[in-house]
């Protein structure tokens, strides 16, 4: 899935490099062996390396976090209990910690420039490296100007692919067959930028980094923790590490029937995309308009996440009002005075708990006033994926719900009828039946009441 050329400048550690019978086993390897966590041995290297890589980034990982990173690792003979028993010994909240008295030998060799352990990649930094092979050419720009120059050399007929994580080939395998040029954008820092004022993310930010970003801003605006939670349902931990926001959206652009969770999440919060073409000209479009946009010789530079749309009207009736909903789904609209609160909730119904596309996914956002019978202030957002390639917003339902009371049961029955009238799932032999998907979407809408 990952092209070898993307690995230029990486520090790669294999399970053999981690330890072995000749050089001595790494503590993680030893723990798996001691707890009976390996039988046939096929899954063991993946389990060991997954934890090793995670502890490199998160040395204070908890048992729950270690549990969650294994959503892409499959064991078919040993069973997960002895494996988890071994790996959770390395958690910060473990009763018995395996690494209490052990020091990683790599930490002894420090970089004189950074004071951190040496990654051995300084010599490769900052170079635009191109490769030309018999089958295809590989370009590796390091600036936006380099990228624009490369794109300007292409025509509308040129078969090229912009490469971020390249995880999309696991979904649409035929997309990889006929490209003459590959453009690796992982060396361009602007495409990995993050900002909280105003809120934005670079197009090439990984899904894992986006989750961390939304969890950080969610501490002051809890609405974003709902988005972080939804992104955590995408694929598996390893794919989220590599896959990017723009790459996922580009799959939606090329395949409108793809039930993209990035697309749904961004539509839920009203995000806009900054699109730049080969000449450097830029424009901002909504994610809904993006799916039909011609992206030839263009790329997604930035995803803008302005909160302006979701700042509630000022209602001067008190401070620090509390809604009786789970905190992870409620934000207080910029901490302004008043009782109006932003309600945000998303769903993903899938055949498995991870590594699966949605049958139906959904997102709901509304300003509600708990002091006024949960009055919906203004126009809410009601979006669905998995209905049809052209359906996103339940526009009739959104308009019907304006300035309605959520606690009015008769009103909600009318809203369900309105929603039923505009939900028309298409037939696809690969998907669940249209009838099932329609009832599922209506059930999710009812669940937020």
What are these model-predicted stretches?
Residues 4, 14-19:
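Glycine/small-residue-rich loop that forms an oxyanion/phosphate-binding "nest" at active or ligand-binding sites
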Residues 21-25:
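Membrane-interfacial loop-to-helix junctions in multi-pass transporters
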Residues 1, 11-14, 27-38, 48-449:
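C-terminal structural segment of proteins
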């Amino acid at each position: 899935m990952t092209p070898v050329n993307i690995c230029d400048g990486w520090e790669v550690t294999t399970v053999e490099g981690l330890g072995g019978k000749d050089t001595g086993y790494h503590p993680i390897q030893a723990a798996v062996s001691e707890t009976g966590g390996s039988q046939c041995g096929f899954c063991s290297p993946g389990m060991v390396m997954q934890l090793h890589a995670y502890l490199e980034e998160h040395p204070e990982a908890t048992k729950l976090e270690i549990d969650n990173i294994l959503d892409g690792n499959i064991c078919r003979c040993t069973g997960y209990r002895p494996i988890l028993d071994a790996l959770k010994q390395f958690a910060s909240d473990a009763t018995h910690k395996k690494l209490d008295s052990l020091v990683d030998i790599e930490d002894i060799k420090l970089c004189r420039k950074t004071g951190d352990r040496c990654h051995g990649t300084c010599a490769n930094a900052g170079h635009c490296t191109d490769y030309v092979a018999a089958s295809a050419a590989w370009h590796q720009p390091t600036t936006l100007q380099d990228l624009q120059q490369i794109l300007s050399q292409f025509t509308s007929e040129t078969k090229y692919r912009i490469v971020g994580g390249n995880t999309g080939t696991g979904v649409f395998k035929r997309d990889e067959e006929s490209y003459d040029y590959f453009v690796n954008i992982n060396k361009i820092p602007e495409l990995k930028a993050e900002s909280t004022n105003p809120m934005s993310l670079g197009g090439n930010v990984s899904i894992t980094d986006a989750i961390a970003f939304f969890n950080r801003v969610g501490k002051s605006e809890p609405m974003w923790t709902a988005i972080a939670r939804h992104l955590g349902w995408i694929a598996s931990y390893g794919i989220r590490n590599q896959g990017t926001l723009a790459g996922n959206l580009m799959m939606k652009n090329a395949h409108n029937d793809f039930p993209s969770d990035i697309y749904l999440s961004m539509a839920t919060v009203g995000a806009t995309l900054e699109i730049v073409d080969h000449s450097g000209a830029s424009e901002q479009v909504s994610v809904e308009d993006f799916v039909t946009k011609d992206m030839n010789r263009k790329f997604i530079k930035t995803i803008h996440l302005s909160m302006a749309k979701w700042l509630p009207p000022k209602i001067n009736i008190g401070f620090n009002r509390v809604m009786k909903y789970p905190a992870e789904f409620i934000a207080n609209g910029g901490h302004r005075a008043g009782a109006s609160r932003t309600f945000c909730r998303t769903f993903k119904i899938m055949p498995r708990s991870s590594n699966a596309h949605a049958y139906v996914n959904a997102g709901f956002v509304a300003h509600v006033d708990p002091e006024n019978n949960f009055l919906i202030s203004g126009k809410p957002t009601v979006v669905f994926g998995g209905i049809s390639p052209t359906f996103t917003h339940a526009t009739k339902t959104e308009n019907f719900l304006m300035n309605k009371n959520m606690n009015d049961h008769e009103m909600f029955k009318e809203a369900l009828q309105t929603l039923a009238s505009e939900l028309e799932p298409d037939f696809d032999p690969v998907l669940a039946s249209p009838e099932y998907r329609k009832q599922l979407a209506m059930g999710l809408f009812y669940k937020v009441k």
